[in-house]
C-alpha cells in the first residue's frame, strides 16, 4: 500500500517504507533495531551518491544529503552500542531489505526517484521521533531528535531541487 504523489506529469506511488520493510526490521531484535535502521541509512547514502553521478549539476546538494545519511548512521551507532558478536544477527536481513528498498526506485526516472526519497526522509524522521518517544535516556532522545532534524533537512533540500526541476 502506498500514497499517490501527483506533480505535473508525474504520478508516483510513494510506499510506506515502515510497512514495506517491516518483514526485515522484525527479524532484528528490538534492542538492536536502531542499528539496523542505521544500516538502511547507509543504503540511502549510497543512493544519493548514485543520484549525484546521474545528475552532476545537482551533485553538491545530493552529496550533502548523502553525508547527512551517513551522519545519522554514525550518531545511531554511537548512541546504541552493540556487542559485535551480534553483527551477523544484525546484518542477516539487510540484503533483502536493501533489495526491497532499491526495487521501489528501479522503474522510476531519477527525478521521480527523488520524489520518493524526499518522502522517505520525512517517514524516516517520523521513525526516529517514534523511537525517541519511548526511549528512557534523555541523551539518546537528543540524538534521535537530531537524526529526525537531519532527515527533514534532506527532505527540504530534495524538495527544493524538485521544485526547481518542475518549474523548468
PLM regions: where:
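Non-heme di-metal
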Residues: 2-168
Amino acid at each position: 500500500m502506498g500514497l499517490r504523489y501527483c506533480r505535473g506529469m508525474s504520478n508516483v506511488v510513494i510506499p510506506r517504507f515502515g510497512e514495506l520493510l517491516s518483514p526485515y526490521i522484525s527479524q532484528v531484535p528490538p534492542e538492536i533495531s536502531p542499528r539496523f535502521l542505521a544500516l538502511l541509512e547507509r543504503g540511502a547514502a549510497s543512493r544519493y551518491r548514485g543520484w549525484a553521478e546521474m545528475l552532476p549539476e545537482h551533485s553538491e546538494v545530493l552529496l550533502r544529503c548523502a553525508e547527512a545519511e551517513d551522519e545519522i548512521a554514525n550518531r545511531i551507532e554511537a548512541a546504541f552500542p552493540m556487542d559485535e558478536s551480534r553483527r551477523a544477527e544484525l546484518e542477516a536481513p539487510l540484503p533483502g531489505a536493501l533489495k526491497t528498498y532499491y526495487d521501489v526506485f528501479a522503474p522510476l526516472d531519477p527525478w521521480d526517484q527523488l520524489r520518493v526519497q524526499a518522502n522517505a526522509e520525512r517517514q524516516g524522521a517520523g521513525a526516529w521521533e517514534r523511537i525517541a518517544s519511548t526511549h528512557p535516556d534523555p541523551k539518546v532522545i537528543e540524538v534521535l531528535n537530531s537524526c529526525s532534524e537531519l532527515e527533514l533537512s534532506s527532505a527540504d533540500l530534495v524538495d527544493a531541487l524538485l521544485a526547481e526541476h518542475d518549474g523548468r
